[in-house]
């Protein structure tokens, strides 16, 4: 059961991390992940690319400085240099330093998210959670993915009630049906594994009523199971 939870707990973070690593190669990202992410992928890609829009970074020199620091860290990450990308030292601010020094900028917020993903990959789930919590965006799908990743951190810390709370926030935050379906199913699976049958029934019933087009029948067995609890 623990292996299953660990695998499921990595799903959201891996989607979010893959999005980040490919943001400067958006065409390849879309081609690679269109089937996996479904109708949500276009909104997510556009949302992240929006962080690097002209209007956000050329007016304020601090924004420009933050962006340069972020892109340097991003380059290190794409080259497989995770420790350099994470940074945190004066000579190499990396994502952590950029998040700390430019927390009010869009690049600073995105750096907090990126640092959180690296900490997650290192198994530092509480640090990852705290960093992800600093990320904010006007894009509702990105906010949903943030809460989903925070939920994954809680799963790996065996704080399952907190994980369910984060998945619920992810469901509520998103204005994209596929993303809402994804986290509804994720919450249902977690509730089922915890034997919280009434809670699981709520989520799977929501899938049956709202998201059958995205589910493809994959949740039918779980829906039938919880109907009799």
What are these model-predicted stretches?
Residues 2-43:
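N-terminal positive-inside, membrane-proximal cytosolic segments immediately preceding the first
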Residues 98-108, 122, 136-144, 171-180, ...:
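Short solvent-exposed coil/turn linkers within tandem alpha-helical repeat scaffolds
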